[in-house]
């Protein structure tokens, strides 16, 4: 079994530049990932925790949209998913097709 690459990006911004923002750091990470296994129109699950009831420990839509855009740029057809219960009330937390860029 080969070792997986682990990427680390500090949440410390330290600079007042756009390239130091968390969104820019995620974009840099996505540029280093290998999306070559995605073929045109492949369905690609973006598996995440969408929250439950009053929980708020979820990934902001701002970041999800960047991941979705990277999958689309590779030719894939992304969709956000979680367990069935969480999917039903995902819109209440802001996870919609319009905000995420995919179903």
Short names for language-model regions:
Residues 1-103:
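N-terminal and secondary-structure boundary signal
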């Amino acid at each position: 079994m080969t070792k997986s690459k682990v990427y680390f990006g500090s949440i410390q911004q330290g600079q007042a530049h756009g390239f130091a923002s968390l969104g820019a750091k995620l974009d840099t990470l996505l540029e280093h990932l290998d999306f070559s296994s995605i073929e045109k129109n492949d369905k690609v699950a973006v598996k995440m925790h969408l929250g439950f009831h009053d929980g708020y420990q979820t990934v902001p839509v701002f970041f999800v949209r960047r991941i979705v855009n990277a999958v689309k740029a590779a030719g894939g057809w992304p969709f956000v998913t979680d367990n069935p219960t969480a999917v039903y009330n995902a819109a209440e937390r802001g996870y919609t097709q319009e905000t995420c860029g995919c179903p």
